[in-house]
Regions:
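Short alpha-helix
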Residues: 265-280
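Core SAM-dependent methyltransferase catalytic element
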Residues: 280-308
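Short, glycine-/aromatic-enriched active-site segment of Class I SAM-dependent methyltransferases
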Residues: 245-264
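Class I SAM-dependent methyltransferase SAM/SAH-binding core
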Residues: 125-128, 135-198, 223
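A short SAM/SAH-binding and catalytic strip from SAM-dependent methyltransferases
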Residues: 207-220
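N-terminal auxiliary segments of SAM/dcSAM-dependent transferases
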Residues: 45-103
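A short glycine-rich, Lys/Arg-flanked "PGG" loop and its adjoining helix->strand segment in the class I
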Residues: 222-237
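Conserved alpha-helix/loop element of class I SAM-dependent methyltransferases that forms part
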Residues: 88, 92-139, 150-157
Length: 308
């Protein structure tokens, strides 16, 4: 694996977020009610954002998947309504996190071409469409397509003779993505319901796979990579943005459900990413870190190829 030099820039977030003192006063005062102000979320500890301990990671894979699905269903509903909820860490990013995740990581020209709801629903850690080197006429699959931001951008790049598939397991995200597709007026797109561990496409169906901060959420990553290799044509390209963990990530972080749904706890180390991709039949692996997202993790671009 070519591990290129880490770009670790300082990113300062706005203090005017759902966890600002003003928000805490109205949302997390003792008499406040509702999900965002439940036990343990007193003033000064709203529970906003990635990293707040609310539960441990379940051992049951189905339960873990349901928890992830619930978080992203909330995110879809929030993005679709254009609303910002106070201290709902399950569905919103703070302003500081928006510097590390979401649509701020895309060029302004790309953002301007997309519906606002697609931008609001973006919870990714990079811009895989910028590094996938998509060509006119290619077929591309986005694993965990969410509100459709990367699918819509990919559809523009492959043109009318190409096609972009989006795969997601969350009904609310699929509904939002299809609305965004209609608003954007893009026709060479199809959104599919399913999981990234069991892709509902035939063998050799696509030439490129992209994904944006999703593979870390899976409890069965070897299955994800096997399915990616299966649906890619021989020589097909794998170009994803994902979080990679440092070797020294502690067990407390690994066992925190909030850190898992926040794309940290389930992240593979660089060595694990390489080993599991190679086991699935990929070669020409490259990992390029882009920015730090946690004390023990970074966002990275991972590129590979299915051996011809």
């Amino acid at each position: 694996v070519a591990e290129l030099e880490t770009i670790d820039e300082e990113r300062a977030g706005s203090t005017e977020s759902c966890c600002s003192p003003a928000a805490q006063k109205t949302c997390c005062e003792p008499e406040a009610k509702g999900e965002c102000c439940g036990p343990g979320r007193e003033a000064g500890n709203c529970g906003c954002g990635v990293g707040e301990v609310t539960a441990t990671v379940p051992e049951d894979a189905a339960e873990l998947r349901d928890t992830v699905r619930d978080r992203y269903a909330k995110a879809a509903l929030a993005a679709g309504s254009g609303s910002v909820t106070c201290c709902d860490d399950a569905a919103q990013l703070t302003e500081g996190q928006r510097e590390l995740f979401g649509s701020s990581l895309y060029d302004s020209d790309d953002r301007e071409a997309l519906p606002e709801a697609a931008q609001l629903a973006s919870l990714g850690c990079g811009n895989p469409t910028a590094v996938a080197a998509l060509n006119e006429g290619e077929t591309v699959l986005d694993l965990g397509s969410g509100g459709g931001i990367d699918v819509l951008l990919s559809a523009r790049r492959v043109g009318p003779t190409g096609k972009a598939y989006g795969l997601d397991m969350t009904d609310e995200m699929l509904e939002l993505a299809r609305r965004n597709q209609a608003e954007a007026g893009v026709e060479n797109v199809e959104f599919l319901k399913g999981t990234i561990e069991d892709v509902p496409l035939p063998d050799d169906a696509v030439e490129v796979i992209i994904s944006n901060c999703v593979i870390n959420l899976s409890s069965d990553k070897p299955a994800v990579f096997r399915e990616a290799a299966r649906v890619l044509t021989p020589g097909g390209r794998f170009a994803v943005s994902d979080v990679v963990a440092d070797e020294d990530m502690d067990e407390v972080t690994r066992d925190d459900m909030g850190q898992w749904t926040g794309c940290i706890a389930g992240a593979l180390t660089r060595a694990d990413y390489r080993a599991r991709l190679e086991a699935a039949g990929f070669d020409q692996l490259e990992i390029q870190e882009t920015h730090r997202v946690h004390e023990h993790a970074a966002s990275a671009i991972i590129r590979a190829r299915v051996a011809p």
